Swiss-Prot record:
InterPro entries: Tir_chaperone
Cited function: Chaperone for the type III secretion of Tir. Probably stabilizes the protein, prevents inappropriate protein-proteininteractions and aids in secretion.
Family under the similarity heading: Belongs to the CesT/SycH chaperone family.
Record's protein name: Tir chaperone
Predominant cellular place of this UniProt entry's protein: cytoplasm
Location(s), subcellular: Cytoplasm
Organism encoding this protein: Escherichia coli O111:H-
GO biological-process terms attached to the record: protein secretion by the type III secretion system
One of the Pfam families matching this protein, by short name: CesT
GO cellular component term, pick one: cytoplasm
Keyword terms: Chaperone, Cytoplasm, Virulence
Length: 156
């Protein structure tokens, strides 16, 4: 029997016009949007799914990075997420958003994925404009925007 996340993922794949996408043996489903934004969905429980945006590797040469990340995480928390987290295997910064499965639709999932993508763009630009660059071979500042963002904005 399929989980609620699996059923939603099937409907989401149909909505966006891809053949099929599914969770792997670790209950993760990963994909790229425009070959720039890497997203992972986790079938965390029968109550919710997690949406992760892969931002990039931690810069080890910038002393202000940790403080700026704490500042960003507070800002995201005040605005309902997503939240910054660290994935030790890839030594990468992620944005994580909890997506409740009650009354979930493919449209709602797509909207929340878009919130994560917009938040990734904003985080990347704000950090870049403060001289902090996340190591990410896919997200290039030129591909995102030439915006002069110096402040975070709500992705919703």
């Amino acid at each position: 029997m399929s989980s609620r996340s699996e059923l939603l993922l099937d409907r989401f794949a149909e909505k966006i016009g891809v053949g099929s996408i599914s969770f792997n043996e670790n209950r993760l489903c990963s994909f790229a949007i425009d070959e720039i934004y890497y997203i992972s969905l986790s079938d965390a429980s029968d109550e919710y799914m997690m949406i992760y945006g892969v931002c990039g590797k931690f810069p080890t040469d910038n002393p202000n990075f940790a403080l700026e990340i704490l500042n960003a995480n507070l800002w995201f928390a005040e605005n309902g997420g997503p939240y910054l987290c660290y994935e030790s295997g890839a030594q990468s910064l992620l944005l994580a958003l909890r997506f409740p499965l009650d009354d979930a639709t493919p449209e709602k999932l797509e909207n929340e994925i878009e919130v994560v993508v917009k938040s990734m763009e904003n985080l990347y630009l704000v950090l870049h404009n403060q001289g902090i660059t996340l190591e990410n071979e896919h997200m290039k500042i030129e591909e995102i925007s030439s915006s002069d963002n110096k402040h975070y904005y709500a992705g919703r």
